[in-house]
Amino acid sequence: MPAILTRHLPILLGLTCISLTSTAWSATCNKPNVKGYQYVGYLKDGLAEVAKDTPQGLKTGFVNAQGKLVIPTIYESMNTVDDSPEKLVPAFAEGVAAVNKNMPTGTKYGYIDKTGKTVIDFNYEYAGNFSNGLAPVRQNEKLMYINHAGKTVFTVPYDDAASFSEGLAVVAKQGKFGYINTKGKLVIPIQFNLDEGDSIDSYRFSHGKAKLFKNGKPFCINTSGKTVACP
């Protein structure tokens, strides 16, 4: 299977099957052999997301490696990027997945475990994957990171914030981005231009490097923010 380009499939970065380039750092991705769905995602922690048309519209749930539906297709589509099915994939991470569904106050995000049980209530306008015990969420237009108990660990004064990868998370403000550590401290300054249409998740670290772009040309940085050779 070809490597998945992080630049074009940012939501997949919660999975293990990622690649910094089209040939380097790739890993095997597996999908369950199941039919009857408009989309079948890659297995992560033994589960894969599926999307199915219902009278209420496209809904998502999860199947196991044998293709058995273990979490019903009751959640809203995770299509936060565009209409291509490959962008519908929220990964289970640290035993939970961020999903969204219609609530009386509108569409809200929460977290479920691998049995489908709600473990963090649907209170958020946005919710990202857990990593390093933290997940980025937006509530009442404020960005923050929460723990597995749903408690706020720290807030961040940025326009957007991503999940952690190798101890760092991308944060963006006014079209530029940098990186914070797990204490919320900005350790790589807000200085890089955010390409139009790209998710900030596409700039996360893998194997000690992050692939960025300047004037359409790629370059890489290490976790200290220094420019290094790309693989």
What is the meaning of each model-derived region?
Residues 1-11:
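Bacterial N-terminal signal peptides that target proteins for export
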Residues 10-19:
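Bacterial N-terminal signal peptides
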Residues 25-231:
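Residue-level detector of conserved, function-critical positions
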